[in-house]
Amino acid sequence: MAGAVISLGLSAQSNGLTDTSRSRHAVMSNTPLGAVKWTGGFWGERFNVYSGTSLQSMWDTWNNPDVSHGFRNFEIAAGTCPGEHWGPPFHDGDMYKWLEAVAAVYAVNKDPELDALMNKFIGQVVKAQREDGYIHTPVIIDERNRGIDTHAFHKDQTVIGTKVGAEDEKGAFANRLNFETYNLGHLMMAGIVHKRATGKTTLFDAAVKATDFLCHFYETASAELARNAICPSHYMGVVEMYRETHNPRYLDLANNLINIRGLVENGTDDNQDRIPFRDQYNAMGHAVRANYLYAGVADLYAETGEEQLMKNLTSIWNDIVTRKMYITGACGALYDGTSPDGTCYEPDSIQKVHQSYGRPYQLPNSTAHNETCANIGNMLFNWRMLESTGDARYADIVETALYNSVLSGVSLDGKRYFYTNPLRMSDNLPYTLRWPKTREEYISCFCCPPNTLRTICEAQNYAYTVNDSTLWCNLYGDSELRTSLGKKRPLAVTQHTGYPYDGKVVLKFVETPKKEDITLNLRVPSWCDKATVSVNGKPEAVSVTPDSYISLRRVWKPGDEVVFDMDMRTRLLESNPLVEETRNHVAVKRGPIVYCLESIDIEDGKSIDDVLIPADAAFTEKDITIDGSRMTALETMARLADNGDWTGKLYREVGSADKSVRVTLIPYYAWGNRDKAEMSVWLPLSR
């Protein structure tokens, strides 16, 4: 469908998380913020925890200057209190992500306390912002402490022409690694979501000023200075600002940002700018930066329809999904490494990469980095590809990442976090990894927690999409949708299901356009090869193809009921044999949920290293509760290897595995929520 010109019409949706209602190269659009509400079930429980406990505990963290200067930095920059900047340069963006989450929750519950909380933060942002639209608290605080009036143009303000310097230089864009454009991108998205959720423009006006500043900056900066695209959230932000304002200058900026990448001298694979983007066909470098870039380019494609961009994105997507993505939807295998792309037997061209994609099929488990932000970036990229193509395989990746490698980043009680998401945790590693093995309330690099919070608090906005005559069901969960397919064409639907642990989904039309054919598209997940559909109790003859949509078109009436029942069986999965770390291993998956084994769920206190899964293993479903959260566990009999003592040994003769042991596997997203334990997704296969 690449290159097709599709008009959603002026009557299609707007005010969604993203607004592609006027995008000529998108086939669907988000429902408006607040149009979908979780009414119970899996996502109702998760939303209640994260919109309550997580949101408040994170605000408490931001407000404790002994722990984090997240909010205090804005107060100092605004002149509300004295002090120095403290913390990483990307903290501003992290706070904007938190605010976006609050706005998304407010769109659902209209809680006046949340409105007041947002007003408090926004007031400091507006006061801190420079007259020219620039805002980056490290620089603003430094200027204020030097007596510069940030609300008047001043000759000592560093705006354009600053030399690129060392990392300790504080001027605007003095250091390309200072995450200024990353922060501004999240300001844009927060301002847009806040406006769409509340109708207010206080933060949005600040975002407009910031976008105008970026336009001026990139129009006048030197090529060296223009290389400011670390973790480019601003690509998505600028395109969404164009959609909200219809200012063509913003779309020109978005396109220029892609062009500038091809002009960088001495670029790096780690930052995806060693070669022009239009020459890139494989995923490379820092996985968060990469996925944010791909998402932003997908946004640009939806507006311009440039065929070359879709060729790049499709090739990169195939590279990720078929050679570089974990079974959990996670991305970024390497903590540190050397780029496989930037060298060919030339030592001088060897480049360092970090938190990055590796070589094809390089997917270690114990040392997997898999930063939560990268996994969220994978969601953002695939969501935008779905909007432009309507291809269900993109929605499938959104679901896989969301249920597994995104939810795994936060504890079930919503208070503790992982930065990395490995697929194996062992106490026997003879080295120390950079990040802790247990969930922490606060980690020094606090970018993932607010990103996870906003993603989960916005998940209801991924459930349905529409155009003038079609309703897509993308994510299944107990929910209520109240929207319109255009002016005075109301549509209301309820959904009841035990998903993701039960494959039966019941959709009921509550309000429909009169005497008008509407297409209902039900997504068939990649794992589903058998399902039935009935309408008002009568079976429908449908073709069930994994990674597709089942289309039902008719004049729907209030009271019509659709039952979509997917056969949800437990499956043993193997990896491509080129993935060395998982050769002759299996993973267990049921529906969209990837399972893992924690050592505390092995009878007799045996080690994970001793457990093998029989090829004919029979699994019994078991309802359990961990830390107040209900879920389905899987119980089976495994084989038990006689591993004995490996002290001082690297190799030895193969031992026996003639004993059995009962094991219970839990959803991967739930690991690390009980006592400290070893964990593994992949387990040796016993044939």
Predicted regions mapped to residue ranges:
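C-terminal beta-rich recognition modules with glycine/proline-rich loops and embedded aromatic residues
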Residues: 15, 65, 313, 396-404, ...
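Beta-strand-rich binding/interaction modules
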Residues: 515-536
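Solvent-exposed loop and edge beta-strand segments that line ligand/cofactor-binding
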Residues: 26, 78-95, 111, 148-150, ...
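Low-complexity, Ser/Thr/Pro/Gly-enriched N-terminal "stalk/linker" regions
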Residues: 2-3, 13-94, 119-161
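Catalytic-core region of carbohydrate-active enzymes that cleave or remodel glycosidic bonds
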Residues: 302-323, 363-415
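Well-ordered alpha-helical scaffold segments within catalytic/enzyme domains
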Residues: 41-45, 49, 99-112, 185-200, ...
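Extended ligand-binding groove/face enriched in aromatic
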Residues: 78-88, 105-232, 236-268
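A surface-exposed beta-strand-loop module
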Residues: 532-561, 570-576
